Amino acid sequence: MKMHPIISLIILSVGFSQQLPKVVETYKNGNIRNITFHKETQTGIEKDKYEAYHYTGRKASEGTYLNGKEDGLWTYWYENGQKRWEGTVKNGQRNGLWTYWHENGQKGSEVTYTDRKEGGLQTKFHLDKECWNEDGNVCECGQYWWEGCK
């Protein structure tokens, strides 16, 4: 009969072991600098998710981990709250389409990464939409700066 409390204790400890504490670092002003979430795996404890914050408290970045390496969607923000860049990471390396924005929120470029290198389609967006015709006069740009005047 004494075995039941021991078995209950083991079952309780295994059941609660999935809820691992998050690690929180703060700035001197008390605001959160970053939060690292962990999970228990067959090989031990490893990072699961990461969030970083600007000194002011706004979110700076977030992403996920797999097998201890960055993996999945990663997003970064400017301090004003606008997206800075976003894309997918696989096994710790950029992979697939990454989108970059200017601080004012306008899209700056799209780059496709293959085998850890920029490759494939790359699209750059003109920030101020100022184009010139053959005579040197300013005109309204097409959708992309390289299209020239409308």
State where each predicted segment sits:
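Periodic aromatic/glycine/histidine/acidic cluster detector
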Residues: 16-78, 82-90, 94-102, 106-150
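Hydrophobic h-region of N-terminal signal peptides that target proteins for export
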Residues: 9-17
